[in-house]
């Protein structure tokens, strides 16, 4: 082991547990909770602006549905995108949430379903809902990646860059990219800043949602080059995460082009 690199301490992923059980509060869960608290604060702040088109009750309903979509979709996505073999051998693994992670792409699908339902129940245009939700997401994503870092999971590939870190649960104890922190910065702080500047300017409906898809897809695709793959690459060229990001980038670009072609639907 090279002593020139930072050796991280072995963080306990649990803040506390109840007795000898696996029930308790984990840092990863706390980060998700803080992300939703911040999202509600920001959403209520925007809803209280004149002519926002939203009430606080509608925001709370939207966020509750979104929370369920993230939790259910994220868990199901993690199982089916990354741990399908484990699930086929042991179907109850799907319900042991304390043993697995959360997939962003699965969570995104869950949020889309939640937005469709919320839009229908509130008799609202889906793209109005999607544009309202998109700027709320990145901050929570950034906190989630910090949770991954504390959990000492989803680390990067081996490297010799000066800021490389050695993760104590890595059997090889190799210096690696802290890819979780790269994602926290790009998918969290940078994407949050871009979207919240963009919504302050005149724009067509659906463009905010399209920009989110492009931004997340591009940032995640880039970081995947230095992130240790969880599963085999596709055709030895791209990772599973990159393959899942390509439809986001293409879909986001299509939505942006479609939105700007509808010149009569500019939001000021």
From Swiss-Prot:
Q: Which UniProt keywords apply?
A: Cell inner membrane, Cell membrane, Membrane, Transferase, Transmembrane, Transmembrane helix
* UniProt pathway: Protein modification; lipoprotein biosynthesis (diacylglyceryl transfer)
Q: What is its EC number?
A: 2.5.1.145
Annotated membrane topology is: Multi-pass membrane protein
Where the protein is mainly located, per its record?
membrane
Q: Write out the transmembrane intervals.
A: 23-43, 62-82, 97-117, 132-152, 179-199, 206-226, 241-261
An example of a Gene Ontology cellular component annotation for this protein is:
plasma membrane
User: What residues does a 1,2-diacyl-sn-glycero-3-phospho-(1'-sn-glycerol) bind to?
Assistant: 145
Q: What is this protein called?
A: Phosphatidylglycerol--prolipoprotein diacylglyceryl transferase
User: Can you tell me which family this protein belongs to?
Assistant: Belongs to the Lgt family.
Query: What organism does the UniProt record list as the source?
Result: Haemophilus influenzae (strain ATCC 51907 / DSM 11121 / KW20 / Rd)
């Amino acid at each position: 082991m090279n002593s020139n690199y930072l050796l991280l301490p072995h963080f306990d992923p649990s803040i506390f547990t109840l007795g000898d059980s696996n029930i308790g509060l984990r840092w990863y869960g706390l980060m998700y909770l803080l992300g939703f608290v911040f999202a509600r604060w920001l959403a209520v702040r925007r809803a209280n602006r004149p002519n926002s088109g939203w009430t606080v009750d509608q925001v709370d309903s939207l966020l509750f549905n979104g929370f369920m979509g993230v939790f259910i979709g994220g868990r199901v996505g993690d199982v089916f995108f990354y741990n399908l073999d484990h699930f086929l051998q042991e179907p109850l693994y799907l319900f042991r949430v304390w043993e697995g992670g959360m997939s962003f792409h699965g969570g995104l699908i869950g949020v889309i379903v939640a937005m469709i339902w919320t839009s229908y129940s509130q008799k609202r245009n889906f793209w109005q809902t999607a544009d309202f939700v998109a700027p709320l997401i990145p901050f929570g994503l950034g906190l989630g990646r910090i949770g991954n870092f504390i959990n000492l999971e989803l680390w990067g590939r081996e490297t010799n860059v000066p800021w490389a870190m050695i993760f104590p649960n890595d059997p090889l104890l190799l210096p690696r990219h802290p890819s979780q922190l790269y994602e926290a910065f790009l998918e969290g702080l940078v994407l949050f800043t871009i979207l919240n500047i963009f919504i302050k300017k005149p724009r067509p409906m659906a463009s905010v949602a399209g920009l989110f898809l492009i931004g997340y897809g591009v940032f995640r695709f880039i970081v995947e080059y230095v992130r240790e793959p969880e599963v085999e690459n596709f055709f030895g060229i791209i990772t599973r995460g990159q393959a899942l990001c390509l439809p986001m980038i293409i879909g986001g670009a299509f939505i942006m082009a479609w939105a700007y072609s509808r010149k009569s639907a500019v939001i000021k």
